[in-house]
């Protein structure tokens, strides 16, 4: 008796995986490398993470201090604006909720800007990084995050297009207004919801 191959499991009748947002395709085991700048080489011992702006207690964590916080794991899907999706993948780090509890956002804080060591920036509404929706991560599939994918640590906001998950993140600044980042100033959507195909301004 023949046995179905792996590729025939979990397909819906329409032939499209329901985990894929409109216009996306499953990249399988690949993890494409896309970046807006030269990939930096950052030693974990010299890396820090700062949360400042509209918070009661601005804070900077060292690599060891961040690792001493309760770990948090994400298992799910990520979606790139260039139309690839990576399904059933995993990252581990610390929930942004944990960092916000320590820094205590002020009542007027509505948005944030994430900044990378390269100077890359991206903006996010504060509500989109709370309640278990965002992380600072340093492992992927159980291995240290490669530098081409943002290592030693990157922001992870998996429910939005992946340019919002800033590589080599080193600072998150809370604001009382929206302040577009690098790609947002160059025509990309301010939010970037893949299920609404918010790739570009006006989408």
Language-model-detected regions and their locations in the chain:
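Structured, non-membrane catalytic/scaffold regions adjacent to prosthetic-group chemistry
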Residues: 2-203
